[in-house]
Regions:
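Short, acidic Ser/Thr/Gly-rich low-complexity loop/linker segments typical of extracellular
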Residues: 288-316
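Hydrophobic core positions of the immunoglobulin-like beta-sandwich fold
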Residues: 318-320
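Bacterial N-terminal signal peptides that target proteins for export
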Residues: 3-15
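Catalytic-core regions of hydrolytic enzymes
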Residues: 35-160, 164
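Active-site-adjacent mobile loop/cap segments within catalytic or ligand-binding domains
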Residues: 56, 130-140, 146-149, 186-262
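Structural motif
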Residues: 263, 271-282, 377, 385
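A short, solvent-exposed beta-strand micro-motif common in secreted/extracellular proteins
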Residues: 325-336
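Extracellular beta-sheet/turn segments enriched in Thr/Pro/Gly and aliphatic residues
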Residues: 340-376
Length: 390
């Protein structure tokens, strides 16, 4: 995310009308599609009691704005996350179609900063959740920001309140999940003006700093899910299934904030690395319970971002919807590596802990390719053997 400018953009009445008309449209088959590793079946409308609560999801930016490493953008990542949150909400809960709105649902729609809050205000949203990732840092951390400032040494949250309460769920849920893979921690769940202007006991501007918090008429929060300028995170951001994990952490937080139970969904995920140098391995075939997953390769996806076949590696795999409490045999196979077989028992989600829905199984594989002796090494060895005879 770039720091949002303190201005009100020109509002497009057409954009607002289009968004309001689109709110009742069901999720498309393409949006809902998952590959063979997703759950074979899930209980429809498992969570009831959504009521008339209106949720507005704001995948930050538009198109391919805020490009990170290798050209993959923040706008693309957060759109995928928002669409997956929508998928989980419509799959697991009885949320009415007219009570969920996204400010954009494809990579072509352009929504200005000011339009986002105006659409939410015109629609009458009860909560505004803005999804972002960050840039330009050396440590891969999260942060959640709700509207607030300091008055005479006292922190004040904007009204209607609720952003802080939502962040108290989302921040640990998202951070603990991401720490399993590439994140190092969090910068906190913060009043936005206090975050950008720390150390002041009495802010002169007593209103939220971020536009989405300042201009929205409802409780709101903006999250930063790691840094798209850090390689370890960005190589995961490119992976389709990894983003489903971030989406589920947000989905789980939304349910907790709204006072609803969390579904007992499960995920098995991990990173497969070379045992000698810890570099993630591309093209590993992972098999469990008759399902297979092959880690990303240059041919499958990385060619979209680089001509260097050896530049990007994530070694990430994920299976969704395995049976909680059951022990599975997991096999890892890759050309040039010894096959690895592991036993894993799937944790049961829905117990309230931040990452109890994901069972993490990281694996190291050993390269079995024969050692290559250079011409120099060969000549040196012959000289040594010859001299040892005398």
């Amino acid at each position: 995310m770039t720091i949002m400018k303190n201005y009100k953009s020109t509002i497009s009445k057409f954009a607002i009308a289009a968004a309001l008309c689109a709110v009742a449209m069901p999720i498309s088959a393409q949006d809902a599609a998952t590959d063979s590793v997703a759950a074979d079946s899930v209980p429809a409308k498992e969570i009831t009691g959504w009521g008339d609560f209106k949720l507005f999801l704001d995948p930050g930016h538009s198109g391919k704005e805020n490009r990170g490493l290798w050209g993959y953008s923040e706008a693309e990542k957060v759109l995928d996350i928002a669409l997956t949150i929508k998928e989980y909400l419509t799959t697991y809960t009885d949320i009415p179609a007219e009570n969920l709105m996204l400010c954009r649902e494809d990579g072509n729609t352009v929504v200005d900063l000011g339009e986002r809050s105006d659409i939410a205000n015109a629609w009458g949203a009860d909560f505004f959740y803005s999804i972002h990732s960050d840039a330009a840092a050396t440590k891969n951390t999260t942060v959640t920001l709700f509207g607030g400032w300091m008055t005479d040494g006292v922190e004040v949250e904007k009204t209607p309140t609720g952003g802080k309460a939502f962040g108290e769920f989302l921040n640990p849920y998202l951070t603990d999940l991401m720490k399993e893979f590439a994140c190092t921690g969090t910068r906190g769940n913060c009043y936005d003006r206090c975050f950008y202007y720390p150390g002041e006991s009495n802010h002169s501007n007593k209103y939220p700093y971020l536009s989405v918090n300042r201009e929205s008429n409802m409780a709101s929060l903006l999250s930063e899910g790691g840094y798209h300028t850090i390689a370890e995170q960005q190589q995961l951001n490119i992976n389709v299934e990894y983003k489903r994990l971030e989406a589920f952490a947000a989905f789980q937080s939304i349910l907790k904030y709204h006072g609803l139970q969390v579904p007992k969904q499960t995920f098995l995920a991990g990173i497969i690395a070379n045992s000698e140098n810890q570099v993630p391995i591309n093209g590993v075939k992972v098999t469990v319970d008759g399902k297979t997953y092959t880690t990303d390769t240059w041919e499958s996806v990385f060619n979209l971002f680089t001509k260097n076949e050896n530049l990007i590696h994530n070694g990430f795999y994920m299976f969704e919807g395995l049976t909680a409490g059951q022990t599975y045999e997991v096999t890892f196979e890759a050309t040039g590596y010894d096959t690895v077989t592991k036993q894993v028992t799937i944790k049961e989600g829905g117990q309230g802990a931040s990452v109890d829905f994901v069972t993490v199984l990281d694996v190291e594989m050993t390269n079995n390719a024969p050692a290559i002796v250079s011409v120099f090494q060969s000549k040196t060895l012959k000289m040594f053997l010859h001299s040892s005879l005398w």
